[in-house]
Amino acid sequence: MIYILACCAGNVKNANVFIFQMAVWLPGPNRFYLPPQPIQRTLNTEEYVRRTSTFLHAATDRLLTVGHPFYNITNADGKEVVPKVSSNQFRAFRVRFPNPNTFAFCDKSLFNPDKERLVWGIRGIEVSRGQPLGIGVTGNPFFNKFDDAENPYNGINKNNITDQGSDSRLSIAFDPKQTQLLIVGAKPAKGEYWDVAATCENPPLTKADDKCPALELKSSYIEDADMSDIGLGNLNFSTLQRNKSDAPLDIVDSICKYPDYLQMIEELYGDHMFFYVRREALYARHIMQHAGKMDAEQFPTSLYIDSSVEGEKLNSLQRTDRYFMTPSGSLVATEQQLFNRPFWLQRSQGHNNGILWHNEAFVTLVDTTRGTNFTISVPEGDASSYNNSKFFEFLRHTEEFQLAFILQLCKVDLTPENLAYIHTMDPSIIEDWHLAVTSPPNSVLEDHYRYILSIATKCPSKDADDTSTDPYKDLKFWEVDLRDRMTEQLDQTPLGRKFLFQTGITQSSSNKRVSTQSTALTTYRRPTKRRRKA
């Protein structure tokens, strides 16, 4: 409100005073936000997938692998003769299950192929590990250690190193970070790592004299035998540590990946990770310093005060701030084990509640608690007397796995709404179900050569050559085929008996189908005992 005071001209004593009130609109201090545009809602698989009362069990044989714990061994021709097998590697299993739509079920009314399609749903998984608990050791015979930051008197003076221009590399080993990890999904797990970023051309953000490259966070699928983080970070050591002395032998020329949990959790359909369990433990065993030229990034002189005594002045050539620590995985105990125990899937972290659309599951794991490296010695000729040169020393690492699954048979109605949603999510699912999708008419007359591979015709197109529809054909996985290892007799398998006990489901003696009858005990009231008359 605005008030206006008005006075009439004339005698001031007899002046008339008038007050006018006027309303004025002012913009409000609050901002107005328009609602966002509506987006398509992502459905949970429980909204369009119906579960049945049929459960099946599938398990692998004993899966074994043997190799060198630090590097691949090749012969004179460059052919790999001994693979690299380390406890710090990822094990990425690609488990294939049979197509349930081709099953011959005893119950003919189980599903209608004209109106429904069958899919598998994971209800339980157990990853069993053999071999005793043990701590692995990794190291480098030429490790870049300039000084001991914990006890400097055991550093460069003991090694007679006087400046950065010398070679201060030593043979150093340590036990890596302790990691237990299990990721289960319908698609491969994703990992992240740091690598050299591409230089900006227009405009250039880096100067010509810049020595340190820019970093970029990259993401890729976790493949079998990829290295995990051992406590020195997830980065591409082959491009970011060119001296090959700042890391152990098993990762000095490798990429250490860390699971990209943020990206897999935020995935729209939740296929890459149904659930995950992990346990990581480490502490700083030793604190040291790396040697190297520091002219590019020298620590400022304003951060320290030099000595006034001429003989005690700080020698900057022997001082470096490139501190690092050697990790240690600490104690390994059976009470801390995540393996050799079942995991039951009731609700996934994403929208896919354990449905295997392409009849395959991806199991990614790391277990460093069984990292013992075997030392094998073989004599050269007659070894009647001991001499170091008379024995060959070898290193080997072994791993043992077994995977077991409980699968539930599920049905999807072939309604237009379901097919439209599934086609938007993954068109290859519709193709695997052998359902035709009407394509728009094409008025262009195409050419089809009969002898396309002969030298008389043109070269075939790349699309014609690529007949494989596998999206992961270029990735490396541990292939496991369980298409002929399915059984409905849950009470005859270890994981099946655990599942029956946990869920309270009873199995009929005919072993042809599984029923979900309740096993609750019925209590009876004992009748009152009458007192006999005397």
Swiss-Prot record:
It is found in: Virion; Host nucleus. Its main location: virion. SUPFAM superfamilies: Group I dsDNA viruses. One of its GO terms (biological process) is endocytosis involved in viral entry into host cell. GO terms for cellular component: host cell nucleus; T=7 icosahedral viral capsid. Residues 507-521 have a biased composition (Polar residues). InterPro entries: Capsid_L1_Papillomavir, Capsid_L1_sf_Papillomavir, dsDNA_vir_gr_I_capsid. The keyword Disulfide bond applies. One of its GO terms (molecular function) is structural molecule activity. Residues 507-534 are annotated as: Disordered. Keywords: Capsid protein, Disulfide bond, Host nucleus, Host-virus interaction, Late protein, T=7 icosahedral capsid protein, Viral attachment to host cell, Viral penetration into host cytoplasm, Virion, Virus endocytosis by host, Virus entry into host cell. Pfam families: Late_protein_L1 (PF00500). The keyword Disulfide bond applies. Forms an icosahedral capsid with a T=7 symmetry and a 50 nm diameter. The capsid is composed of 72 pentamers linked to each other by disulfide bonds and associated with L2 proteins. Binds to heparan sulfate proteoglycans on cell surface of basal layer keratinocytes to provide initial virion attachment. This binding mediates a conformational change in the virus capsid that facilitates efficient infection. The virion enters the host cell via endocytosis. During virus trafficking, L1 protein dissociates from the viral DNA and the genomic DNA is released to the host nucleus. Belongs to the papillomaviridae L1 protein family. Self-assembles into homopentamers. The capsid has an icosahedral symmetry and consists of 72 capsomers, with each capsomer being a pentamer of L1. Interacts with the minor capsid protein L2; this interaction is necessary for viral genome encapsidation. Interacts with protein E2; this interaction enhances E2-dependent replication and transcription activation. This is Major capsid protein L1. The lineage of its organism: Viruses, Monodnaviria, Shotokuvirae, Cossaviricota, Papovaviricetes. The gene is L1.
